[in-house]
From Swiss-Prot:
A GO biological-process term: 1-deoxy-D-xylulose 5-phosphate biosynthetic process
Pathway: Metabolic intermediate biosynthesis; 1-deoxy-D-xylulose 5-phosphate biosynthesis; 1-deoxy-D-xylulose 5-phosphate from D-glyceraldehyde 3-phosphate and pyruvate: step 1/1
Protein name, UniProt field: 1-deoxy-D-xylulose-5-phosphate synthase 2
Gene Ontology CC annotations of this record: cytosol
Top-level EC class as recorded in UniProt: transferase
Catalytic activity reported: D-glyceraldehyde 3-phosphate + pyruvate + H(+) = 1-deoxy-D-xylulose 5-phosphate + CO2
UniProtKB keywords: Isoprene biosynthesis, Magnesium, Metal-binding, Thiamine biosynthesis, Thiamine pyrophosphate, Transferase
Binding, Mg(2+): 144, 174
Self-association state and partner proteins as the record states: Homodimer.
Entry EC number(s): 2.2.1.7
């Protein structure tokens, strides 16, 4: 009987021998490769934390002790050890989340997937424990690049200020950037420095020497400096010790005995401690280890033996952008690129290979990236900052005060905009068009197809006196959606027949094919429809108000929050122009969306062609005085969804 099937909770690990734990680690890696190859998910990071997670759950008593995960995609092993072994629907509707989830287990504390936040959480929980006089331990696991985020260092600065507040910080270093521990002396120093006796010895020595006339303080400083210099020569601990944090490591993150020993010492220390673990991303899976650039950080469905994708769906939005950036780079030497530790996921890998001196990876530091972009623009180049839409939220103040206020020509390219689906609430890029509406001078484009991505990216990088934004969806890009005409700066995708048109349907971005389907359904009901794509949704095109005035109803459809989005902006523009036409906006309701496929999420929130057509039909019927019970029921359903 496999050991893994006998693990129903963390305490089941206590009775296992070292040999059995080693076997369990192998079983977990086999399970992860098999399960994630069928569903997709974050494979490489989880293969690297198997032994670390086993050790954490043997040393600490979750859920009484709080085990917190930064960049929560490292939590698959944690899920397996806390009673969640059904990975058959990982990241699918009704299945396990790809991140920690309070709704799944009492062992999950924070539902995070945005990096560098866990130390702030740990600081707060440790403070609460102290106030409430609880003896619970707090363990924060941070790594996979998250220490490149400024928030992590802000938290460390606060954590270090409380020497008597217990908090264990595990640095999961899978980048192989630190040297291994050198010999027994380093091990001895690491052990000695996290014991109460050693701390008392240092305190007494300092007290005695400082009372000694003339030579006391200089002698203590000399001895302490020599000790520190020796330890810093042996192990890369200086940056943590300079903050006042005790340091254990580096520890082999795949040596269970060493891990348990280090974590046990840290647990007993009684103050903030760094435990530095060296792990190997993708460990035990040869295709991941051979992928030096990414180590299978996140994968779709793959062949487990080879790691090759099972199928490809043609060109995707990201690759279209990446290819066009490469062309722009060849044409314009002043175009540079910025990424926040996402070079390949945002499509800048080809640009980086061709122009290594014109691409800047700022780490998981979107705030710094935006300010650095402002400086680049001030210096005469045009930066293109490619980032997931959900992560731009972190840099809003910098976009507003450093880029827009200074009228800097910076282009932000927002990948994964709108409903992304399987990555859940924290990864849906559903707020960008709302929060960016308030930024003076900013121009925002929402391309509907690959041709428009190329065209609007080129339009954006010409602007040198204001920030520009180009947003697009996740996944396959689909066929081109041709325009049949032009009104102002807007593309007409469907012109009405003869007579007064009923509905002006404003289609935003990738929802254009669905909006054309809505128009077809309305036409079958005898409702004539004009479909327009604004292309640039901020500012609202000046031709919008006079065009709306020639219709009976205006309908906006966007892959963004209904609150403060494009629909709200169009409504305000019509009011300002004195155009009194009913407007119905369709978008994402103001709530967090559970993980499911994009199609399932859109269906659940009523953002489908049949749903929209039914409601617009009811609205037109009310205008005609043909309001009926069916129309009322439609409104009630929509109200419930909101």
């Amino acid at each position: 009987m496999p050991l893994l099937t006998r693990i129903t909770g963390p305490r089941d690990l206590d009775r296992l021998s070292l040999e059995e734990l080693t076997q369990l680690a192998e079983e977990i890696r086999t399970f992860l490769v098999d399960a994630v190859s069928k569903t997709g998910g974050h494979l490489g990071p989880n293969l690297g934390v198997v032994e670390l997670t086993l050790a954490l759950h043997r040393v600490f008593e979750s859920p009484k002790d709080k085990v917190l995960w930064d960049t929560g995609h490292q939590s698959y092993v944690h899920k397996l050890l806390t009673g969640r072994q059904d990975f058959s629907k990982l990241k699918m509707k009704g299945g396990l989340s790809g991140y920690p989830s309070q709704g799944e287990s009492e062992h999950d504390v924070i539902e995070n997937s945005h990096a560098s936040t866990v130390l702030g959480w740990a600081d707060g929980i440790a403070k609460a424990n102290q106030v409430m006089e609880r003896d619970d331990h707090v363990v924060a696991v941070i790594g996979d690049g998250a220490l490149t985020g400024g928030m992590a260092w802000e938290a460390l600065n606060n954590i270090a200020a409380a020497k008597d507040r217990p908090l264990v910080i595990v640095v999961n270093d899978n980048e192989r950037s630190y040297a291994p521990t050198i010999g027994g002396l380093a091990n001895h120093l690491a052990t000695l420095r996290t014991t109460d006796g050693y701390e008392r010895f240092l305190a007494r020595t300092k007290e005695v020497l400082e009372r000694t006339p003339v030579v006391g303080r200089p002698l203590y400083d000399t001895l302490h400096g020599a000790k520190k210099g020796l330890k810093d020569f042996i192990a890369p601990q200086g940056m943590f010790e300079d903050l006042g944090l005790k340091y254990v490591g580096p520890i082999d993150g795949h040596d269970l005995e060493a891990l348990e020993s280090a974590l046990t010492r840290a647990k007993r220390f009684g103050g903030p401690v760094i435990v530095h673990c060296l792990t190997e991303k993708g460990r035990g899976y040869q295709p991941a280890l051979q992928d030096e650039a990414d180590r299978f950080h996140a994968v779709g469905k793959i062949h487990p033996d080879t790691g090759l994708p099972i199928s490809t769906s043609g060109a995707d939005w990201t690759s279209v952008f990446g290819d066009e950036m490469l062309k722009l780079g060849k044409e314009r030497e002043d175009v540079v690129a910025i990424t926040a530790a996402m070079l390949q996921p945002v499509g800048l890998d080809k640009f980086a290979k061709a122009f290594p001196d014109r691409v800047y990876d700022v780490g998981i530091a979107e705030q710094h990236g935006a300010v650095s972009a402002a400086g680049l623009a001030h210096g005469g180049v045009h930066p293109v900052f490619a980032v997931y839409a959900t992560f731009l939220n972190r840099a809003f103040d910098q976009v507003l005060m450093d880029v827009a206020l200074h009228k800097c020509g910076v282009t932000f390219v927002l990948d994964r905009a709108g409903v992304t689906g399987t990555d859940g609430a924290s990864h849906n890029g559903m707020w960008d068009m709302s929060i960016l509406q308030v930024v003076p001078g900013l121009r925002l484009a929402a391309p509907r197809d690959a041709d428009q991505v190329r065209a609007q990216l080129r339009e954006a990088v010409v602007v040198d006196d204001a920030p520009t934004v180009v947003r697009f969806s996740k996944g396959a890009v689909g066929p081109a959606v041709p325009a049949v005409g032009r009104v102002g700066g807007m593309d007409v995708l469907r012109a009405p027949g003869t007579g007064t048109p009923d509905v002006l349907l404003v289609s935003v971005g990738a929802l254009a094919p669905m909006c054309l389907e809505v128009a077809d359904l309305l036409n079958k009901q005898g409702i004539s429809t004009t479909v327009v794509d604004p292309r640039w949704v901020k500012p609202v095109d000046e031709a919008m108000a006079p065009l709306a005035e020639r219709h009976r109803v205006v309908v906006t459809v966007e892959d963004n929050s209904r609150v403060g989005g494009v629909g709200s902006a169009v409504a305000q523009a019509l009011r300002d122009a004195g155009v009194d036409v009913p407007l119905r906006d369709f978008g994402i309701p103001p709530r967090f969306l559970d993980h499911a496929s994009r199609a399932e999420v859109l269906a659940e929130i009523g953002l489908t062609a049949p749903d929209i057509a039914r409601q617009v039909t009811g609205l037109v019927a009310r205008l005609d005085g043909r309001y009926d019970r069916a129309g009322a029921e439609v409104d009630q359903v929509e109200a419930a969804r909101d």
